[in-house]
């Protein structure tokens, strides 16, 4: 994902000042300054590099239900046009791991318990030292919220995700 964002930041004349940015997911129970937070990763790869109109970060401290409700309200105010996403080694998009991915989810933002494969990916990607240090709970945009965007751009670097991409494209929907 970093390659895509870096490339986007170098395209001349993109109207960044008209972009309202959201991010798709983040861990609960990490301090706001934790480098593993996706808001902080995006800060370093995108938010600090271009003059965005607004940036909405998922807060990770507070009551999870209130976090979800407040973020969902912001999404109603500024619906998503474009999503840049990837696929995890277990096939997750955002933090919609296969066991909780719901194409009929009535919510737009929800709390999820992360699948162990997803958590191990965070260790394998050197974001955390051990699986025990990876948060178990997270906030994520739901599948219907993601699919409501006008356009989705999915990039999946790394051979370790080959099976997940193949299953996503050619496998049965379960």
Predicted regions: what is each one?
Residues 141-144, 148-174:
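ATP/nucleoside-binding phosphotransfer catalytic cores, i.e., glycine-rich phosphate-binding loops
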Residues 1-12:
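Glycine-rich N-terminal segment of FAD-binding domains in flavoprotein oxidoreductases
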Residues 1-3, 89-92, 160-161:
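Gly/Ser/Thr-rich loops at beta-strand to alpha-helix junctions
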Residues 14-84:
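Ligand-binding beta-strand-loop-alpha-helix segment within the catalytic cores
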Residues 94-141:
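Class I SAM-dependent methyltransferase SAM-binding "motif I" and its flanking Rossmann-like core
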Residues 12-16, 102-104, 173:
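A short alpha->loop->secondary-structure connector
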Residues 78-103:
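Glycine-rich phosphate-binding loop
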